[in-house]
Amino acid sequence: MVYDIEYDVVVIGGGHAGIEAALASAKLGTKTALITIDKEKIGLMPCNPSIGGIAKGIVVREVDALGGEMAKAIDQTGIQFKVLNTRKGPAVRSPRAQADKEEYRKYMVNKTNNTENLTVIEDEVIDIVLKENKNEVDGVITDKGLKIKTKAVVVTTGTFLNGLIHIGDKRFPAGRMEEKPSTKLPEFYKRAGFELFRFKTGTPARLDKNTINFSILEEAPGDNPPPKFSFWTEPKGSYWFKEKDQIPCYITYTTPETHRIIKENLHRTALYGGAITGIGPRYCPSVEDKIVKFEGKDRHTVWLEPETRDGISIYPNGLSTSLSEEIQWQMYRSIPGLENVVLLKPAYAIEYDIVMPTELYPTLETKRIRGLYHAGNFNGTTGYEEAAGQGIVAGINAALRALGKDEPFIIRRDEAYIGVMIDDLTTKGVIEPYRLFTSRSEYRLHLRQDNAILRLYQKAYNIGMLNEEEYKFVKETEEEIKNWINIYKETFIKDGDKKVSIFTYLQKPEVDIQKLKEMGIAVPESDYIQEEIEINVKYDGYLEREEKLNEKMKYLEGIKIPEDIDYSQVAGLRKEIVQKLTKFKPMTLGQASRLEGITPAAITALLVHIEKMREKRKTG
């Protein structure tokens, strides 16, 4: 094929996965093209106007630690900030922010259009071209007829592949409301042998702020001081804004009348009327799903969230539905404060195609086709944050392939929630839209929101995602934390009638850094360093115990499975285990150990076989 132009990496889709993939690829020095149907909708928030939440907020900080953009964007455009789970331990706390979705979109449009090595192309990719051997990417073809040669393609199409919107008994093709779906690219996947599955998600109506009676509703303000997401937002090296003007949300509830309206019209919903075949998200159900599944509950919480700082659009979090539009008006008006509400846009459900993520390596490259990467909703996940986490990993690996680097970029389960998510996706697959929770991790005490930068800065620096100045700053911060902890271990004070180290004294539940300061004991100036010291001191024993449990997994993750292994030649493996390993192609013994049905005995047999393969290669 004769190509019109050449890029090292092509990213398809300008959502939250595509943005991080494209920016990461460009940052690593590859000539990158971001191809999207509408370049003014890069970074659009089609559902909730927020970033972060339980586990999700930790992922945003991990993306930031890896050199990504989402955290910086929300810090600049957020209108309310808070930390969730503050009554619980630090392992499960997460930041969350309400976004001005228009300002967020503008920020990302500007960023992608003004990044070195990155070109934004307004077009639709309708086909992916393979080399003659049929298992490696060679280029893409667009709807406008542009033929682009490339070494790697990252597909981040969100809900656009064969997207179908449902509003009651009405349905029509769309990728998002008022945007056309991608119907030609799925044909490539069918030809290439990928099986496509149908998933479903939904979004509530948008409400006119001027028609809501806020005076009778419960106000939900942000935190003071407000938490920020990026380690690099001023004041640099802190996770707290000095000042940030915030806008409140409001809380209301469904009523028995709401539930009656929904129950009487269940047959008119796309979900219960049988029109939807796709599988929906368990942890973000439609309101009709909640009414059916939690029949004994007399009310459900609704959060009224502003979509912009100065606009009139309100997002009623908790009220997504596929009811017909006329019934939606009745339902929304049965809720306190919304008696006279006007709907700006109706709620809708959307079905779309995904590829099972077990088709991928932990690099997010497909096993079938070299140079083809998937990220975001297309992998069966839900949420902007999960998409961004996958996007940055896919973008980094696509760039490394384009640059001819042999060592892939892989994040382990013990290193980050991004690693937990990707490992879950690639080893277990999905039976419903995947959402990240802290409970999915075995290493919650280590994978906290406060230490994301400390966990990942070395990996980011090693591949070029952090510069020298950034690396030096984090390194010095880490050294200062260690130095203060050592000082506290070596300095003794009187506690009643006995002498104890400051370290031991700080482990007492009633003692914090502020108490030490009041006692005249020196403490670091940085609020971030104070927080890190206190967490590390108070959880010292638990962290040590978790680290010991982690050692075995690290050992198994360190043993790579040769690409040319023939599982049928491994002594002692049952036939079904041979079939599973051959199908999933795990990259390490650690990944193999997490596949369903793989026994400890099978791992031992694999270890012995791999050692024999190594010895054979040494002796020639």
From Swiss-Prot:
Q: Which Pfam families match?
A: GIDA (PF01134), GIDA_C_1st (PF21680), SAM_GIDA_C (PF13932)
Subcellular location per the Swiss-Prot or TrEMBL entry: Cytoplasm
Q: Which cofactor does it need?
A: FAD
Q: Which SUPFAM superfamilies has this protein been placed in?
A: FAD/NAD(P)-binding domain
GO terms for biological process, alphabetical: tRNA methylation; tRNA wobble uridine modification
Which residues does the annotation say bind FAD? Answer: 13-18, 125, 182, 377
Q: Might you report a single GO cellular component term? A: cytosol
Question: Is DNA repair among this UniProt entry's keywords?
Answer: no
Its function, per the record, reads: NAD-binding protein involved in the addition of a carboxymethylaminomethyl (cmnm) group at the wobble position (U34) of certain tRNAs, forming tRNA-cmnm(5)s(2)U34.
- Spell out the protein name for this chain: tRNA uridine 5-carboxymethylaminomethyl modification enzyme MnmG
Lineage here is: Bacteria, Pseudomonadati, Aquificota, Aquificia, Aquificales
